[in-house]
Amino acid sequence: MKKIMLTLASALMLFSLVSCKGKKADGKVWVVATDTVFRPFEYTNEKNEFVGIDVDILAAVAENQGFKYDLQSLGWDAGVAAVQVGQADALIAGATIKQSRIESGWIFSDGYYNATQTFVVAKDSTISSYEDLRGKTVAVKNGTAGMDFANSLKDKYGFKVAVFEDSPTMYQDVILGNSAACCEDTPIMADNIKTGGLALKIPEGMESEGAPYGFAIMNPANQELLDMFNAGLKNIRENGTYQKILDKYLK
């Protein structure tokens, strides 16, 4: 009888532990890192609200899938590092899905936006082709598809590359004349010129073919979050929410 009672008590204890574990999982808050300024994907508006395409897509996906998250605006390099060391579970920051990133351990979601990269010059610049960059300097943001695009052309067209840690500083380097051009994701650049009044312009014919942005994790233990993102992304595409978000920021 005592043995039966002990077995029953053990079973009840196990049930209690499993129940508590389930409740803890249900209340999990996923930590998601993002950039500080990558308009229109993430930025602080005039009301001091952190907004953008990435911000709204994540919110819509989380609502659709019923998970909680803590979005932390850390900056690109700090956000990447946070995921790499496990201080954040995922990254959403206009991260281009690239083979080199996959090989280094990043695990990406389905693409949620296809972006091209473009060269950008000062408003009064006469540069209109890659050939015009010979002997000059092109500014890029560290770790971005824009940097990759510029590096893929620098030897062929004979220009140097200067690396910056954030987009605003990179833009200013071109405006001040230190760099002849910069290379940035096209939607980002178009929005910054339009809304920020930057004395920059986008020459025709100096644009890449483009690649998709993805939500990314590094720890395979966070696959559940990635699966929920993919499922939610599919649903918000189908119900029209996704297009409404794009229209809100890109039109």
Q: Which residues make up each language-model segment?
A:
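C-terminal motif of bacterial Sec signal peptides marking the signal peptidase cleavage site
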Residues: 16-19
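Beta->alpha turn/N-cap motifs
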Residues: 34-38, 72-77, 86-99, 123, ...
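Periplasmic-binding protein-like
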Residues: 36, 113-121, 190, 194-233, ...
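Short beta-strand-to-loop elements that line the ligand-binding cleft
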Residues: 68-75, 158-166, 173
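A ligand-binding cleft/hinge motif common to bilobed small-molecule-binding domains
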Residues: 81, 94-103, 151-152, 175-176, ...
